[in-house]
């Protein structure tokens, strides 16, 4: 009876959670064998029949060949092998002709494979890069039998370590061979031309000339050679090429190519670069404190996930808006757009199995998955508008549908004021002294204000007089003269009785060196001893800080200290250019003795 009641309570709790959830569980297959990333998922009406299908670039784990899969509902409609691992998948309209059937672009290796009606349509290959001239020369020597394979390997390894241009695939394969296989490889490939090919790291789409949903779009490619390429949607020619300081891994775009657009690229060096139309190099740069793991544009805010388990919000000019800490590491991110309610939010899948949905830094919803989610996609699937598709680390497929009555509310989901507004503040009671002071301020407010203003003016006058006196007597550590613009500061090191005194003297002019200066120390000879109280300063080059070191010996055993004055003098002048007063510390060695 107890077991039966426990089972009934668990089932009742599950039904209650499902009733309170904003999502309907449409499908869950833990053995779907789909291993992919968010960039390799795309939803599109591939046949123009109103039935949206899911395009998956499957990585093919466990030695399996990568494959392109198209799913209709929970079942796989078609499969086709890929020559290399997929980097990204996107659907776009190539032209304005009827019927308006979108094309499918899949980036894999150095190529973009374009499909129409799920049939191969076009293959775009990245242009080849010029090879390393040193590498070309080494292979020419091997072609003429001037060097043996072992020498060839040593020279290629030396080039790989020192050269900025990476080696070709042919040379990299040769360096991986055993000694017995090298000679046959050299004889087979020494007559071939050295080719250096880059690969695609990320891809997205950019509207060509209209912002409409059914307008033609260009493909934007990020490559391993630190470049961004914009392709024409019909001829597949390169319309624009932009350079980046590092390899792009995530891309976000806005605008139209023929009007005005903005490209945002998150790169491997931990920075985010923002480019505008007609700019060959980045206009803005956002430096992150950790590597980015995702980039999503929500309205005009760039949301970045980092390896420090946090989400950051930035403007398009790089200004940081907010930061939200996550309870676990972020695995992947994507955009949630509910067009019927005008909602845009960011989805972040965490390593603890949670999928968190944020609007700015406000938490809207949390989904608990049975396994860590590695890819996310939200949009129209089949004939349902708001469908969430997730794949898990173990290869599972999860499909959820957002309820039509679901409304996302910030925080815990409860409508009303936050709990902090209902908490009473512990305001202290008014004391007799507080009441008397309030009455006094009301009665004598004008006189109190006049007294305050008089004291303030006197303080400003005394400060101005002291400043003028310091300038006239060169008591300041900075020189205000145009001929000798100098800056001085001192550092005392040690516990005593011997201290190390370091003077940092800097010529702050832009192009004029300073010569003929001397340094003089004024001190109490009964308390301190210096090896040299007057010495000449070398030539001061503009912009450099010169450390001038000396040692100070404390002679007093009574635990007292005094001030040492440092004067910077010009030869032939009695007034010092600079001066500094150094308060010496108490000698701990003599005090302890």
Curated annotation (Swiss-Prot):
<dbReference type="GO" id="GO:0005113">
    <property type="term" value="F:patched binding"/>
</dbReference>
<keyword id="KW-0552">Olfaction</keyword>
<keyword id="KW-0813">Transport</keyword>
<dbReference type="GO" id="GO:0006629">
    <property type="term" value="P:lipid metabolic process"/>
</dbReference>
<keyword id="KW-0969">Cilium</keyword>
<keyword id="KW-0653">Protein transport</keyword>
<dbReference type="InterPro" id="IPR011047">
    <property type="entry name" value="Quinoprotein_ADH-like_sf"/>
</dbReference>
<dbReference type="GO" id="GO:0045444">
    <property type="term" value="P:fat cell differentiation"/>
</dbReference>
<dbReference type="GO" id="GO:0005102">
    <property type="term" value="F:signaling receptor binding"/>
</dbReference>
<dbReference type="GO" id="GO:0060271">
    <property type="term" value="P:cilium assembly"/>
</dbReference>
<keyword id="KW-0472">Membrane</keyword>
<comment type="function">
    <text>The BBSome complex is thought to function as a coat complex required for sorting of specific membrane proteins to the primary cilia. The BBSome complex is required for ciliogenesis but is dispensable for centriolar satellite function. This ciliogenic function is mediated in part by the Rab8 GDP/GTP exchange factor, which localizes to the basal body and contacts the BBSome. Rab8(GTP) enters the primary cilium and promotes extension of the ciliary membrane.</text>
</comment>
<dbReference type="GO" id="GO:0030534">
    <property type="term" value="P:adult behavior"/>
</dbReference>
<dbReference type="GO" id="GO:0001764">
    <property type="term" value="P:neuron migration"/>
</dbReference>
<dbReference type="Pfam" id="PF14779">
    <property type="entry name" value="BBS1"/>
</dbReference>
<dbReference type="GO" id="GO:0005929">
    <property type="term" value="C:cilium"/>
</dbReference>
<dbReference type="GO" id="GO:0021591">
    <property type="term" value="P:ventricular system development"/>
</dbReference>
<dbReference type="InterPro" id="IPR032728">
    <property type="entry name" value="BBS1_N"/>
</dbReference>
<keyword id="KW-0963">Cytoplasm</keyword>
<dbReference type="InterPro" id="IPR056419">
    <property type="entry name" value="GAE_BBS1"/>
</dbReference>
<dbReference type="GO" id="GO:0005119">
    <property type="term" value="F:smoothened binding"/>
</dbReference>
<dbReference type="GO" id="GO:0001895">
    <property type="term" value="P:retina homeostasis"/>
</dbReference>
<dbReference type="GO" id="GO:0034464">
    <property type="term" value="C:BBSome"/>
</dbReference>
<dbReference type="GO" id="GO:0061512">
    <property type="term" value="P:protein localization to cilium"/>
</dbReference>
<dbReference type="GO" id="GO:0036064">
    <property type="term" value="C:ciliary basal body"/>
</dbReference>
<dbReference type="GO" id="GO:0008104">
    <property type="term" value="P:protein localization"/>
</dbReference>
<dbReference type="GO" id="GO:0043001">
    <property type="term" value="P:Golgi to plasma membrane protein transport"/>
</dbReference>
<keyword id="KW-0206">Cytoskeleton</keyword>
<dbReference type="GO" id="GO:0031514">
    <property type="term" value="C:motile cilium"/>
</dbReference>
<keyword id="KW-0966">Cell projection</keyword>
<keyword id="KW-0007">Acetylation</keyword>
<dbReference type="GO" id="GO:0005813">
    <property type="term" value="C:centrosome"/>
</dbReference>
<dbReference type="GO" id="GO:0035721">
    <property type="term" value="P:intraciliary retrograde transport"/>
</dbReference>
<dbReference type="GO" id="GO:0042445">
    <property type="term" value="P:hormone metabolic process"/>
</dbReference>
<protein>
    <recommendedName>
        <fullName>BBSome complex member BBS1</fullName>
    </recommendedName>
</protein>
<dbReference type="GO" id="GO:0061351">
    <property type="term" value="P:neural precursor cell proliferation"/>
</dbReference>
<dbReference type="GO" id="GO:0051216">
    <property type="term" value="P:cartilage development"/>
</dbReference>
<dbReference type="GO" id="GO:0008594">
    <property type="term" value="P:photoreceptor cell morphogenesis"/>
</dbReference>
<dbReference type="GO" id="GO:0045494">
    <property type="term" value="P:photoreceptor cell maintenance"/>
</dbReference>
<dbReference type="GO" id="GO:0061629">
    <property type="term" value="F:RNA polymerase II-specific DNA-binding transcription factor binding"/>
</dbReference>
<dbReference type="GO" id="GO:0060170">
    <property type="term" value="C:ciliary membrane"/>
</dbReference>
<dbReference type="GO" id="GO:0007601">
    <property type="term" value="P:visual perception"/>
</dbReference>
